[in-house]
């Protein structure tokens, strides 16, 4: 592994294909025999530092259509946190089912799970049938792993019955020195970004693109008013940028004055600070307060000059969903991709059916959508929202930060890269966008 890292750091990328693939590598993993380690504890008390381990593991066998990537940097997503606390289910069930699919997938069913759904690195080897990529290519990866043997997946690969999220529902993820991916997960690394910056957008940028921009999601157009929950977070920060770049009008909901300042630095003008407004959408565990929905709607109209949101960008889930359905414009769209505050949503259906609103479920992105989202990064139209970077040995703390929402934007992790700031190829473009690239750093 050290020889591979040294070749990459020396820019000897043409030599990569001649280097031996190591028999083992270090990866961040959870263990099957520790699935019950948090049993009986409330979710908030489950500490990823207890369950995430950095260990030496065997390098998986490379199969047809696959690639082994030398990973320079990765990042932490909520699915890493879910894996680490074994909620809502243990991911070992995913690996067991995937392992039964074929002889090729059997290797994923192991007593450990190497996690991570983002990477930036260099292709080390490609399997039979891979023609687009070669050893030495600098790449990032999106996290859709799909078999594409069913006709349902050929219209939209997210509809494939064998669609999985790499590093969450499959093994050999990106929080490691090496990763195993399908070749159709690979995309060109933006040359003006460092390894850690390039690794940060993948999952959340692609998710936001499908959810907000794609015809498979809200199909946002110029002039749309878009209410964005958690607008300074890992997902919302990309939705905010896409709304601004697409000619829409984002109304950014944040939870502190500091987060309000972050979205203003991105260019947002209409900002709602939930902490200052004191919204309480739930009277108690069982009953919501429609008067609070109305108060939110009034605030939105004050900011927009009387317009209700054409689109509500939803991901908090239970806590906000009733309010989201209420405040959306007549004929508007509530598009949801997650439920971080709870999966059991409750809303007043009269505001949905009588006002001809629609709820759209959105999950990650297909290859085309992920590619287009990455292209926006490469063009300098969308920028990473990386706030902090940890070494791989401290990945438990990185996951804890995300678990406790003690972070802004994305939290990065160095794997093979020995330090931050490496991997830039296009210095002129970087200089042009440096302020935007760094606006989340240190916040």
Please describe what each predicted stretch is:
Residues 2-23, 322-326, 367-443:
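C-terminal hydrophobic helical "lid"/dimerization subdomain
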Residues 4-20, 35-73, 112-114, 129-130:
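A short N-terminal beta-strand-loop micro-motif at the entrance of redox/enzyme domains
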Residues 58-75, 88-152:
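Glycine-rich beta-strand-centered segment in the early N-terminal region that forms part
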Residues 102-111, 117, 144-230:
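NAD(P)H dinucleotide-binding glycine-rich loop of Rossmann-like/cofactor-binding domains
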Residues 207, 234-235, 319-320:
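Hydrophobic/small residue at the entry helix of a nucleotide-binding pocket
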Residues 221, 328-329:
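Helix-to-beta-strand junctions that scaffold the AdoMet/dcAdoMet cofactor pocket
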Residues 228, 244-319:
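Adenosine-nucleotide cofactor-binding segment
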Residues 339-355:
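Rossmann-fold NAD(P)-binding glycine/threonine-rich loop
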């Amino acid at each position: 592994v050290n020889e591979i890292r040294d070749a990459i750091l020396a820019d000897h990328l043409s030599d990569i294909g001649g280097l031996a693939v190591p028999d083992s590598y270090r990866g961040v993993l959870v263990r099957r025999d520790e699935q019950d380690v948090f049993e009986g504890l409330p979710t908030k008390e489950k500490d990823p530092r207890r369950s995430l381990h950095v260990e030496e593991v065997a390098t998986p066998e490379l199969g047809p259509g696959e690639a082994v990537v030398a990973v320079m940097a990765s990042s932490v997503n909520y699915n890493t946190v879910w894996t680490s606390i074994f909620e809502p289910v243990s991911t070992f069930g995913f690996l067991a089912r995937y392992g039964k699919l074929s002889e090729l997938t059997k290797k994923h069913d192991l007593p450990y799970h190497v996690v991570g759904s983002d990477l930036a690195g260099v292709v080390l080897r490609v399997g039979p049938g891979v023609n687009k990529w070669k050893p030495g290519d600098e790449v990032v990866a999106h996290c859709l792993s799909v078999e594409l043997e069913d006709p349902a997946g050929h219209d939209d690969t997210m509809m494939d019955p064998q669609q999985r999220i790499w590093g969450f529902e499959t093994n050999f993820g990106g929080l490691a020195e090496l990763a195993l991916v399908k070749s159709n997960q690979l995309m060109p690394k933006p040359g003006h970004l460092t390894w850690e910056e390039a690794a940060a957008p993948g999952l959340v940028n692609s998710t936001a693109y499908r959810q907000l921009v794609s015809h498979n999601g809200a199909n946002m157009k110029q002039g749309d008013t878009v209410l964005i929950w958690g607008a300074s977070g890992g997902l919302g920060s990309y939705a905010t940028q896409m709304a601004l770049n697409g000619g829409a009008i984002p109304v950014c909901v944040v939870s502190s004055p500091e987060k309000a300042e972050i979205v203003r630095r991105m260019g947002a003008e209409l900002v709602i600070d939930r902490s200052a407004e004191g919204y309480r959408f739930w009277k108690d565990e069982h009953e919501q307060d429609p008067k609070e929905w109305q108060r939110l709607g009034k605030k939105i109209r004050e900011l927009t000059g009387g317009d209700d949101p054409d689109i509500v960008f939803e991901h908090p889930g239970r806590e906000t969903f009733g309010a989201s359905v209420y405040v959306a414009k007549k004929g508007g769209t509530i598009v949801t991709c997650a439920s971080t505050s709870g999966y059991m949503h409750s809303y007043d259906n009269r505001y949905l059916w009588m006002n001809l609103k629609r709820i759209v479920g959105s999950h990650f992105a297909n290859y085309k959508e992920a590619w287009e989202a990455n292209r926006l990064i490469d063009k300098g139209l969308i920028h990473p929202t990386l706030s902090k970077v940890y070494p791989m040995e401290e990945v438990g703390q990185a996951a804890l930060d995300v678990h406790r929402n003690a972070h802004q934007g994305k939290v990065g992790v160095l794997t093979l890269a020995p330090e931050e700031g490496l991997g830039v190829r296009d210095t002129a473009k970087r200089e042009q966008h440096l302020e935007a690239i760094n606006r989340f750093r240190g916040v």
